Swiss-Prot record:
Gene: Hmox1
Taxonomic classification: Eukaryota, Metazoa, Chordata, Craniata, Vertebrata
GO CC annotation terms, alphabetical: cytosol; endoplasmic reticulum membrane; nucleus; perinuclear region of cytoplasm
Site-annotated residues for Important for catalytic activity: D140
UniProt binding sites for heme b: K18, H25, Y134, R183
Keyword Phosphoprotein appears in the UniProt entry: yes
Residue numbers bearing the Phosphoserine modification: S229, S242
Keywords: Apoptosis, Endoplasmic reticulum, Heme, Iron, Membrane, Metal-binding, Oxidoreductase, Phosphoprotein, Transmembrane, Transmembrane helix
Subcellular localization, as worded in the UniProt entry: Endoplasmic reticulum membrane
Enzyme Commission (EC) number: 1.14.14.18
Protein's name according to its UniProt entry: Heme oxygenase 1
Gene3D superfamilies in UniProt: Heme oxygenase-like
Length: 289
């Protein structure tokens, strides 16, 4: 890897990360899915799949944050009460999948790839953990409330916020002020130009992992509508042993209310619209950072 020169990127880490991900911001601003997202058309089935993936991702991320909470390379960014999402996602899993959600939620290959990278970073390259925290938390914080309202309306969800706890940060009064604090803390992290370069590259990797996940889910849901075979569903339910209990997959709980969709929308179109929403959870939020 080519060593960056000291003056080849902004001095502040927050500015360096923003600069490094500028191309993704431009893509997000001009992408066609942004237009679809604004229509608020979201597939319930696809939304459930992504929420399950987010549960696995945040479980891994926050396990590694806890591992490194006293490590100087991350400690200034340790805000568990304000930012951590695992507990909120557990509430959402119970809403979407029922009381036995731990036994049945899917963990796709792309999700496993994402989880593996998070554990690898936390255990062997903790100085890169900031890139994943920055990409996820500030993005979610920036776009969370807007996305929550769109999802509530599109899927006729309760106004109380059930099923969407992930998008709510009850311990942050002002997202704008908190993001300013977070960036200031980021800029106190001591790192060489080479390490800073590696952190910015890892932020790009985080974006690629998200894109890989959404592309995979697009293929999976499209194929599932064509041929919903038992073997396919069994493969979908394979989960990392470190994340859930070692139990046999259970059948999906019955009795969950189903939200009807327009008969004029094909399954493929419904999924494209869902993908628009899912990508927006990264793109809209990150663009607002």
């Amino acid at each position: 890897m080519e060593r960056p020169q000291p003056d080849s990127m902004p001095q502040d880490l927050s500015e360096a990360l923003k600069e490094a991900t500028k191309e993704v911001h431009i893509q997000a601003e001009n992408a066609e899915f942004m237009k679809n997202f604004q229509k608020g058309q979201v597939s319930r089935e696809g939304f459930k799949l992504v929420m399950a993936s987010l549960y696995h991702i945040y479980t891994a991320l926050e396990e590694e944050i806890e591992r490194n909470k006293q490590n100087p390379v991350y400690a200034p960014l340790y805000f568990p009460e304000e930012l951590h999402r695992r507990a909120a996602l557990e509430q959402d899993m119970a809403f979407w999948y029922g009381p036995h959600w731990q036994e049945i939620i899917p963990c796709t290959p792309a999700t496993q790839h994402y989880v593996k990278r998070l554990h690898e970073v936390g255990r062997t390259h903790p100085e890169l953990l900031v890139a994943h925290a920055y990409t996820r938390y500030l993005g979610d914080l920036s776009g969370g409330q807007v996305l929550k309202k769109i999802a509530q309306k599109a899927m006729a969800l309760p106004s109380s916020g059930e099923g969407l706890a992930f998008f709510t940060f009850p311990n942050i009064d002002s997202p704008t002020k908190f993001k300013q604090l977070y960036r200031a803390r980021m800029n106190t992290l001591e790192m060489t130009p080479e390490v800073k370069h590696r952190v910015t590259e890892e932020a790009k990797t985080a974006f690629l992992l998200n894109i890989e996940l959404f592309e995979e889910l697009q293929v999976m849901l499209t194929e599932e509508h064509k041929d919903q075979s038992p073997s396919q569903m069994a493969s979908l339910r394979q989960r990392p042993a470190s994340l859930v209990q070692d139990t046999a997959p259970a059948e999906t709980p019955r009795g969950k209310p189903q939200i009807s969709t327009s008969s004029s929308q094909t399954p493929l179109l419904q999924w494209v619209l869902t993908l628009s929403f899912l990508l927006a959870t990264v793109a809209v939020g990150i663009y607002a950072m």
